A protein has these predicted regions:
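Short, small/polar-rich loop/turn modules that mediate ligand/substrate recognition or access, typified
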Residues: 197, 202, 253-255
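C-terminal substrate-recognition "lid" of short-chain dehydrogenase/reductases
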Residues: 128, 143, 231-266
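Conserved glycine-rich Rossmann-like NAD(P)H-binding loop of the short-chain dehydrogenase/reductase
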Residues: 33-47
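The beta1-alpha1 cofactor-binding region of Rossmann-like NAD(H)/NADP(H)-dependent oxidoreductases
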Residues: 42-43, 60-72, 113, 237
Length: 267
């Protein structure tokens, strides 16, 4: 349908080499957009762009560095003459290097300040900077759609019982920083939607539910049991939502949070 057609438009996707970033790039390209796959690792984002063929290119950038982002925006405008869509997808989620210490290290009382600061830098400051540098170009042009990737954990608190083993022992805790940063992204989305509404730039959030990605069978079953649709998301389940938010199909939608979670937050 023409409402969903992104032909002639240029989209930048940050965190393009990640599990969902790859899918966002593919979905936008299939809808007709020229996609700029952006990640901190040049080789991995090059592989993503290669899969897009003539519909994409890779440009490495650091979302926490405004100089790097200015270079990215200038390069894209020199190449295509426009920026129509920005998908703020880059984020980090805690991984503990020592599984044996994960239980104690992930407790709120013990959570390392360094990990807190690093996640804030990428997950919140990165979204702020990308929007400030790249989104400002869109506002000056009087058009565009910004999609901030948040999470169900920005809406509801983690159920820590999900992270127990089959015997009921806590394996680790979902740490405080990921829900905190995703909640901040949702608040920032509303701010920016109101701020740039008159400039023709729409700003919405996409909040995915849990994505199946090699978790053990017990976790998958427990998560699925808490979801009305009875399963975790597949990485491809968010393609339609990204195209919808990027396209004219959502032309009267801004400041909203599109939950794609199989009903996880409904119960």
């Amino acid at each position: 349908m023409s409402l969903f057609d992104l032909g002639g438009k240029t989209a930048i996707v940050t965190g393009a080499a990640g599990l969902l970033g790859r899918q966002h790039c593919q979905a936008l390209a299939e809808a007709g957009a020229f996609v700029v796959a952006t990640d901190s690792d040049r080789d991995t984002c090059a592989a993503v762009a290669e899969a897009l063929g003539k519909s994409g290119i890779a440009i490495a950038a650091d979302v926490t560095d405004p100089v790097s982002l200015r270079q990215l925006a200038d390069a894209v405008r020199s190449l295509t003459g426009r920026i129509d869509v920005l998908v703020n997808n880059a984020a980090i989620n805690d991984k503990f290097e020592n599984p044996a210490a994960a239980l104690e290290d992930s407790r709120f009382e013990n959570y390392p300040l360094e990990m807190w600061k690093r996640s804030l830098e990428v997950n919140v400051t990165g979204v702020f900077l990308c929007s400030q540098v790249i989104g400002a170009d869109m506002a000056r042009a009087g058009r565009g759609s910004i999609i901030n990737v948040a999470s169900t954990y920005g809406v509801v608190a983690p159920d820590q019982s999900l992270y127990r083993d089959p015997e009921g022992r806590q394996r680790f805790y979902k740490t405080p920083v990921y829900p905190t940063t995703k909640g901040a992204v949702l608040a920032f989305t509303r701010f920016l939607a109101a701020y740039w509404g008159g400039a023709g730039v729409r700003v919405n959030a996409l909040s995915p539910g849990g994505v199946e990605n090699g978790q053990d069978d017990f976790f998958v079953a427990e998560y699925s049991r808490r979801t009305p649709l009875g399963r975790m998301a597949a990485p491809t389940d968010f393609r339609g939502a990204v195209v919808y938010l990027a396209s004219d199909a959502s032309g009267y939608m801004t400041g909203a949070n599109l939950l794609v979670d199989g009903g996880f937050t409904a119960i």
